[in-house]
């Protein structure tokens, strides 16, 4: 088995009030738009209860779109798309007090593309 670790940490925003956290990472059954700190697996499977809470063990999703976004300034967002064919766990850390975003990706394979989209 091959593991790929990718860790990205955004610098804190100027004010914590503009920080909302990371959103995205697949088709989510959660009522929350922004992800809580926790683990979020991406692996297509037909599950009877896809509701997620970010607690271990992570729940698999019905459909996967490994794209996430976070706000890094008042009117600026960063989007990241991971084009991977392997099962992947995303470890999310949203620090609402400091306005810092942390995400770590652990994939079971080593080949893929990563696209970063920046807004002005």
Q: Residues of each region from the PLM?
A:
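Catalytic and substrate-binding clefts that recognize carbohydrates or anionic sugar/phosphate headgroups
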Residues: 1-120
